[in-house]
C-alpha cells in the first residue's frame, strides 16, 4: 500500500504543477492518517477524500484548497493556520478538534457534525454551511462577513466576540432538532448569536 500511495501522491504533485495537463488528481478512499507521512499530509490540496479518517494529529499550515471531502472523520485533530479555501466538505464529522487561525473562505459545508470543537481567530468569510450541527462548540473572534448559514443547529454552543456578524449574507439557525426543526429568521438568528455571546 505504501508504494501505491507514493505513486498516487507523485502523480498528484505532477497534476498540480502542470495544472491538470499531466498526472492525475489524488483520490483517496478509506485511508487513515497513520498511513500517511507528514509530507503526504501536506499534499492534500485539491484532492478528493472519501471515508478517510484523521485521528490524534496536528495539522499545521496544511492547504485543503479546493479539496473535496465525503464522509470523513476527524477526531482530536488540531488545525493550525490551515486553509479550507473553496473546499467542499460533505457528511463529515469533526470531534474534539481545535481550529486556530483557520481560513474557511468560500468553502461549502454540507450535512456535517462538529462535536466539542473550538474555533478561534478564524474566518468564515463568504462560507456556505447547510444543515450542519455544532454541539458544544465555542467560537472565538470569528469573522462572519458574507457568511451564508442555512438550517444549522447550534446546541450548547457559545460565541466570544463575533466579528462582522451584521455583514453576514444569511444566517438561519435551527434551535430545534433535525426531526422537529424550529427555524429562526435571519434577524432572529443574529439576535440568538448575540444573546449567546460572552
Predicted regions and their residues:
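Tandem repeat scaffolds
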Residues: 4-10, 20-198
Amino acid at each position: 500500500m505504501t508504494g501505491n500511495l507514493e505513486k498516487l501522491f507523485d502523480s498528484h504533485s505532477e497534476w498540480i504543477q502542470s495544472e491538470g495537463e499531466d498526472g492525475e488528481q489524488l483520490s483517496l478512499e478509506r485511508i487513515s492518517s497513520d498511513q500517511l507521512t507528514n509530507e503526504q499530509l501536506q499534499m492534500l490540496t485539491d484532492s478528493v477524500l472519501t471515508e478517510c479518517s484523521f485521528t490524534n494529529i496536528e495539522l499545521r499550515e496544511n492547504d485543503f484548497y479546493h479539496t473535496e471531502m465525503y464522509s470523513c472523520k476527524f477526531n482530536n485533530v488540531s488545525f493550525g493556520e490551515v486553509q479550507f479555501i473553496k473546499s467542499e466538505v460533505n457528511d463529515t464529522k469533526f470531534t474534539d478538534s481545535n481550529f486556530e487561525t483557520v481560513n474557511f473562505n468560500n468553502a461549502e459545508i454540507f450535512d456535517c457534525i462538529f462535536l466539542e470543537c473550538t474555533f478561534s481567530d478564524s474566518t468564515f468569510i463568504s462560507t456556505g454551511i447547510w444543515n450542519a450541527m455544532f454541539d458544544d462548540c465555542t467560537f472565538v473572534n470569528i469573522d462572519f462577513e458574507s457568511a451564508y448559514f442555512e438550517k444549522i443547529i447550534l446546541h450548547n454552543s457559545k460565541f466570544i466576540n463575533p466579528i462582522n456578524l451584521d455583514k453576514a449574507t444569511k444566517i438561519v439557525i435551527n434551535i430545534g432538532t433535525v426531526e422537529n426543526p424550529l427555524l429562526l429568521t435571519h434577524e432572529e438568528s443574529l439576535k440568538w448569536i448575540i444573546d449567546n455571546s460572552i
